[in-house]
């Protein structure tokens, strides 16, 4: 049977403000990218989400971002190398402490939002994130955009990389994500997202936003937890994959 990792960005609530339906999503995914307090989340949300993931045997990842909670980490920041190294270490350390207190372990790091997109093309910021991860634990893997430059940059210094695709995002003809600033960048229809996820999982091409067929190689598929249809998307993806004998399972 074919297997594929299904992940979601979770733990992004803050105080009395609630984002998504994390517990229900955790019942369906195999990996949880949990916010570490910089782009979203807080100490209580972080700890509760880690415990909930561990209780469901869901793999735990550090979802690190720019220190920009007001912008939800989706604004580009020009940040010095040493500062980004330190902020990477700081965020991983926070979730590692929560994991240790829960009897769990952090297995990978997935950057968020603008940081994720920047390090896919910017070798300097990518180097800072890679350095921070390696200083904390070189056994942590990096989850990154499939086919982006950071994949080889991280592998060149010994980091394991998990190449990621997105069930709920549109792609360009060259296999890149369509900018969120453009209409149609985010997919909200469960049927469409499930069809795209199945293609990723089975090594088939997807249809770009401009109509071309695009083949994107990956071993993990993401559904954004802040997508209003997140739960419906995940439910449809899981049932569609199962109907085609694809099992949702950890990437490692």
Swiss-Prot record:
Task: Please indicate which superkingdom the organism of origin belongs to.
Answer: Bacteria
Keyword ATP-binding recorded? yes
GO MF term list: 5-oxoprolinase (ATP-hydrolyzing) activity; ATP binding
Q: Which Pfam families match?
A: LamB_YcsF
Q: What class of enzyme is it?
A: hydrolase
**By its UniProt entry, which Gene3D superfamilies does this protein fall under?**
Glycoside hydrolase/deacetylase (3.20.20.370)
Matching InterPro entries: Glyco_hydro/deAcase_b/a-brl (IPR011330), LamB/YcsF/PxpA-like (IPR005501)
Mind listing the GO biological process terms from this record? carbohydrate metabolic process
Question: Is-annotated flag, keyword Manganese?
Answer: no
Catalytic reaction list: 5-oxo-L-proline + ATP + 2 H2O = L-glutamate + ADP + phosphate + H(+)
Enzyme Commission number(s) of this protein? 3.5.2.9
Alphabetically ordered keywords of this record: ATP-binding, Hydrolase, Nucleotide-binding
Similarity comment text for this entry = Belongs to the LamB/PxpA family.
Q: How does it assemble?
A: Forms a complex composed of PxpA, PxpB and PxpC.
What's its job? Answer: Catalyzes the cleavage of 5-oxoproline to form L-glutamate coupled to the hydrolysis of ATP to ADP and inorganic phosphate.
| Protein name (record) | 5-oxoprolinase subunit A
Organism name: Corynebacterium glutamicum (strain ATCC 13032 / DSM 20300 / JCM 1318 / BCRC 11384 / CCUG 27702 / LMG 3730 / NBRC 12168 / NCIMB 10025 / NRRL B-2784 / 534)
